[in-house]
Structures are given as structure tokens and as C-alpha cells.
């Protein structure tokens, strides 16, 4: 039985934060959603819809929403952060003085801290201190499908097993499976890298390079995930699961993916600024490609696909030139034992 006193505060009223808040509210957890946009918050709290990010989808009437962060967090048993990566540090800095001792913080944000390239768990630990239970929620999950109640599976990773299980229990239900693990680095890496790789697949599809090219890029993209994971302390099985392969396949093939749509637009010849403006929401890959390559270069790992995406997003080369560079690479073994040969060249 759910503890009636267990209250969940969800921070971030975009599509993903709204979807997760609606999910746990439907599971009978007292849930309050915090956001900055007054109109969005009012539409959720009064009309039970997020007119901007999830239009025409009804939300639970029990879900409350507010622009008052202190009110949202007051009395919360744990907090779920679902803001874009560029707002993660600022949000935690505002949150920290409002948290009671022992209140855990989970996040469904994907990416790195902009500028520093730090993993988000490093940022959270620095801001929230060494005693706060932490966890990351990740996996193949489009917000719209979650809100519509379509079957979804994610994974929750954290060092505190009790808190990790608590987060998973709140999300787990008839149409939403929540697995658990303790590889925070691997979970975060997969969630960040898949956005970058999805741009490459989107470009290939926009250029009409065919299904063979799509499959090849996805597979070699997974190879890049595994190679980088091996030198930063992540476990390969995490990247072969929902946090890596699962999220990669969804983001690279699903038309709801903003990063795939960005790549598709670029592949069709659209400018970067026009493509981002047309999408109308944050596209994490634009910033994340720099941070992925920062980690690769610091660790001496070659990531040709990610590097090409970074160059395209910096507008240093055209999408066509990027594909030509990848296709012109010298022939070499596939390195099926890549899990154990972190420094092999792709």
C-alpha cells in the first residue's frame, strides 16, 4: 500500500516533467508540479492540460501545479527534477536550501552540465551534499506516449538502493515498467550520447541514404557509447540495456525525437537556426555534442560519428561533408570485443 504521506515534487513543467508528474499522480501519489511559465502552470492546475507541451491530453485532476518552488518542495518526501540540462545547476542551487534533511533527489534530465561537461550526478552531489540520496531516471521514453498511457520501460540508477527502489516503485505500474540499477555513470552517459547520435541518423534519413545507412549508424553509434563507457567507469551492460541501446534506438528512429528531427532538417538542407526554431523546444544535442567530445578527447577515445555531428552542429562542415568523412574512413576490423578494448579505433 502506498504511504499516504509520501509526497512527490516534480520540477520542470515541460513535456517530460509533466508526463512524469502525471504518471506518479495516476499511481495515487500526492504530486505537485513546479514550473516557471505562469500560463502553463495555470493550464495544468485549472484545466488539467499542458496546452504548450502536451496539448489536448488530459492530466489527472489530482495533479497540482505551482510557480512557487518553496511551496512545491514543502513537505515532499522526494523530488524529481526534469528540467533541461542548461537549467539543471541553477534549479538545484535554488532547491538545496529548501530541502529537509534526508529528502532524496532524482532527475530525468539527460546531458552534461554545459560549459564544464560534468556529469549531472557530480553537479548534484556538489550542490546537495554527501548525504542526500540521489538517483537518475533514464531510458527509451517519449513524454507524449507516457502521458497517453502507452507501454514504456525505463531504468532508475542510484547508489542508495532504498531510494532508487522508492523512485522506481512510484513510477512502476500496469503500463510503465521501472527497472533498477546502480551504474549512475553509465545511465547518464547513455542518456546524453543518444541525443548526439540521433542527429547523425536524422541527417542520413534527411539525405535519403536508406535503411542500411540508418542501421549501420545506430550500430556504430552504440560502439562509440561502449568505447567511451569503458574508460570513464561505466559498465557495458548498462549501455546494452534501456539506458543505452534502448534509448538510442528510440531516439534515432522515432519521429517524436527532437534530436532526430533536427538532423533530418539539416539533412534536407535546412539551416541550423531555422531547424531549431521550427522544433520550438530545447534540442539537447546542440550543447551535448561538445561535452561528449570533451570527454572523448580527455580520455583519448576516438568517436568519429559524434565528432562529425559536433562539426555539423558548429556549422564547420555541411551534413553532406560529414557523411563523406565517415564513409572515407579506412577499413578496419569491427572489434566485436569492443567492451574490453576501450582504446581501439572505430
Swiss-Prot record:
NADPH binds at residues 15-16, 36, 110, 143, 258, 282, 284. GO terms for biological process: carbohydrate metabolic process; glycerol-3-phosphate biosynthetic process; glycerol-3-phosphate catabolic process; glycerophospholipid biosynthetic process. Pfam families: NAD_Gly3P_dh_C, NAD_Gly3P_dh_N. Keywords: Cytoplasm, Lipid biosynthesis, Lipid metabolism, NAD, NADP, Nucleotide-binding, Oxidoreductase, Phospholipid biosynthesis, Phospholipid metabolism. Gene3D superfamilies: N-(1-d-carboxylethyl)-l-norvaline Dehydrogenase, domain 2 (1.10.1040.10), NAD(P)-binding Rossmann-like Domain (3.40.50.720). The active site is at residue 194. One of its GO terms (molecular function) is glycerol-3-phosphate dehydrogenase [NAD(P)+] activity. Sn-glycerol 3-phosphate binds at residues 110, 139, 141, 194, 247, 257-259. HAMAP family: NAD_Glyc3P_dehydrog. Belongs to the NAD-dependent glycerol-3-phosphate dehydrogenase family. Catalyzes the reduction of the glycolytic intermediate dihydroxyacetone phosphate (DHAP) to sn-glycerol 3-phosphate (G3P), the key precursor for phospholipid synthesis. This is Glycerol-3-phosphate dehydrogenase [NAD(P)+].
